[in-house]
Every structure is written in C-alpha cells, then in structure tokens.
Amino acid sequence: MTLEQIKEIYSRPLTELILQALEIHNKNFGNDIELCSLKSIKTGTCPEDCKYCPQSGHYNTSIEKHKLLDKDSILAEAKNAKDAGSKRFCMGAAWKHIPKKDFDQVAEIITEVKNLGLETCVTLGSINAEEATKLKEAGLDYYNHNLDTSREFYPEIITTRKFEERIETIRNVANADINVCCGGILGMGESLDDRFNLLLELLQLPAAPKSIPINTLIPVKGTPLGDKYTDAQIDSFELVRFIATTRILFPQARLRLSAGRENMSLETQTLCFLAGINSIFYGNKLLTENNATINSDNFLLAKLGLESNVELC
C-alpha cells in the first residue's frame, strides 16, 4: 500500500466509500459494539511534553493527580467489572517509562486480574524487550501505545520522545506475543497528508494492531493545543472519511471511537458506525476528561439496534 493508494481510497465519493467500508465490516464482524471503560491507575506529573495532554508535568492544568493506586483498590474495581459482565480490564498510567520500583507491583496486579478470569490490557509508556516478556509472563493480553500522528508532524506535538521509540515499543510488544493496540489523534492542526501517513505507519507496524483507537483532540486549557484551539480541527465528513478508509485498510481490527466523542452529534456518531467503528469508550469519564454519557450511549445504541459487547478497558 502506498500513500497515493490511501489518498485514492479516501477521495472516493462519500457514499461509495462508506458502502465499501460497511461491506468489509459486515464480512468480518457482526452487529456488536464493544463497550470499553478506561481506568487511570496513575494520573498526572508525566515527564512527557505532549502538547494535547493535561497529564503532562510541563503544563498547569486542573486535573487531580495521584500516584499508582494500591493493588487492593485496583482489584476491587476489576472484580466489580467482572460482576457487571466485563471480559477485559485495562489500566492506564501517565509514565514515559514504567519506574523500576513500580514494575513488579504492576506485573502482580496484571496476574491477579488475569486470575479473576478477565483479559488484561495496560498502557504504561515505553517498555523494552525484557519488560514486554515479563508482562506477557504476568498474563498481559493487550498493550496500548499510540503513534499519535504522522512521523512528519510528530515533532510539532512531542519533543521528549522520538517517533522511532514508539515503533520500538510496539516491536517489543509484538515480539513478546502481546496484542497491539495502536492509533492516533486527529484535529491537532495536522494536514490531510499527515493523516494518510499515520495510516501508512500503522500498516507498516511490526505487527498489525488488533484494535485502533481513533481520537479527536479535546482542547484542555493549560495545554499548548488547548490554549490554541477551542475545538478539534477536523469536521465530521473528514472524520467519517478517515474511519471508512481505516476500515478498508484494516478489515479485521477493532476501530474504537475514543476521545472527543462527547462533542459529536448522534448523527455524526451514527455515520462513524456505518463507516466501520465497532468499539467505543463507555462511561461518563475518559481518564481525566468527560466522555459521552451512559444514558446518551444507551439511547443511541437502542435507536440503531446495535448489540453491546461490554468490556472494561
């Protein structure tokens, strides 16, 4: 697949593009929507300078910071998740790299969550090959590590971690036989070519991602992008085109409509489902920011006749 081929797919008449994406989607998936909730186990004071992120220690934002939660409180949430019918429990921590002093505790938590009969997922920043192997041995099923944007636009968003470091982490995850979860953020001021190049980078990953989070910028006051923009720099038609193109390129991946969904109309979300979205974050909170409400999601899923497959991520 080349950049020009991706452009050609994206530029097809919108109805034709959505129809092709829907046909591919229906061939590989049923009528279910994966519902995920995201738990932050360590919040804020991150040394990274990602210009969109309120958890960066470089910026003055109003988030409530906390250190790594204790094991018992995390396991209590995991048990509640299982009792509610969840199949997977995912934990996110605001680290550039997991501290050595916390690694064994996180690995132990993964093992105990796994022993509850749940699938496990974490996002902990960069990890090396040895750490990936140990996480796999602890029972880890999925690791999330987003590329965020194209290689070319990346230096405009992050300077504390090189793009190739992200690729290396994904390579370590894949080599350890852990499922890869990897996507990006739209509406940060990137060009269309940057979006196409992001898709090309995802196609060239060491292992095909099992799930692809598609985020739109949530401008948070105190962050550089939050002070620059009042909303995501992408319109609904561009978003739907991007999703449909992603579905065509990744027929067997779960496409998750993630951050920014609370700012989308029900009609826009419906078009996103038609274009290939089959996973959403479910719950009123998404890490540190508000998410679409549970009542709103229940109303929309019922209206569309979509079946929910509840997981806690």
Curated annotation (Swiss-Prot):
Pathway(s) it belongs to: Cofactor biosynthesis; biotin biosynthesis; biotin from 7,8-diaminononanoate: step 2/2
The organism's place on the tree of life at top rank: Bacteria
Keyword RNA-binding applies: no
Gene Ontology biological-process entries: biotin biosynthetic process
Catalytic activity, EC: 2.8.1.6
A Pfam family annotated for this UniProt entry: BATS
Stated role: Catalyzes the conversion of dethiobiotin (DTB) to biotin by the insertion of a sulfur atom into dethiobiotin via a radical-based mechanism.
Protein name, per record: Biotin synthase
Organism expressing this protein natively: Francisella philomiragia subsp. philomiragia (strain ATCC 25017 / CCUG 19701 / FSC 153 / O#319-036)
Lineage: Bacteria, Pseudomonadati, Pseudomonadota, Gammaproteobacteria, Thiotrichales
Gene: bioB
